[in-house]
């Protein structure tokens, strides 16, 4: 599970989800990638679930890169608690994903295997996404 080892502040403001991604919009390490088409908070559990789905499908071949990291805490107040008395306790670690961001990359497998593995991973994520191929330099 991806969790920061230590953080300067235990609780943060919620990051804004509007606007498009400014960096990390191209496939840079692998041959294939998953590109976000909608904004979302992706939790560390969702990232791990997508990674497992991909690696199980490609079996021993290929290499997977994870380009996002859950570095923001999201807080939650306990059920049936009155409002007030401070901010809730950190519940999840999330990555703020904006449209255009490449989340995962994959290489070392055939096109059919890569497309199916990435399709399985997309189903584990809480956003709309598409499969993209590396541009040029093949």
Curated annotation (Swiss-Prot):
Q: Which Pfam families match?
A: Ribosomal_L16 (PF00252)
Q: What are this entry's molecular-function GO terms? A: rRNA binding; structural constituent of ribosome; tRNA binding
Q: Does the keyword tRNA-binding apply?
A: yes
List keywords of the entry alphabetically: Ribonucleoprotein, Ribosomal protein, RNA-binding, rRNA-binding, tRNA-binding
Q: Which parts of the chain are coiled coil? A: none
Query: What is one GO cellular-component annotation here?
Result: cytosolic large ribosomal subunit
Bias category Basic residues: which stretches?
A: 1-16
| Family matches, as NCBIfam families | rplP_bact
| HAMAP family found in the cross-reference section | Ribosomal_uL16 (MF_01342)
- Name the UniProt record assigns to this protein: Large ribosomal subunit protein uL16
Q: Give the source species.
A: Arthrobacter sp. (strain FB24)
Task: Name the gene behind this protein.
Answer: rplP
């Amino acid at each position: 599970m991806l969790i920061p080892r230590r953080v300067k502040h235990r609780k943060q403001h919620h990051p804004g989800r509007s606007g498009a991604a400014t960096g990390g919009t191209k496939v840079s390490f692998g041959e294939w990638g998953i590109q976000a088409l909608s904004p979302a908070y992706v939790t560390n559990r969702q990232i791990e679930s997508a990674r497992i789905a991909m690696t199980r499908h490609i079996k021993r071949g290929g290499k997977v890169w994870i380009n996002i990291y859950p570095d923001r805490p999201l807080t939650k107040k306990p059920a049936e608690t009155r409002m007030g008395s401070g901010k809730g306790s950190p519940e999840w670690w999330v990555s703020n994903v904006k449209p255009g961001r490449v989340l995962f990359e994959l290489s070392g497998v055939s096109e059919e295997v890569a497309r199916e593995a990435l399709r399985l991973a997309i189903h584990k994520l809480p956003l709309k996404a598409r499969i993209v191929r590396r541009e040029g330099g093949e």
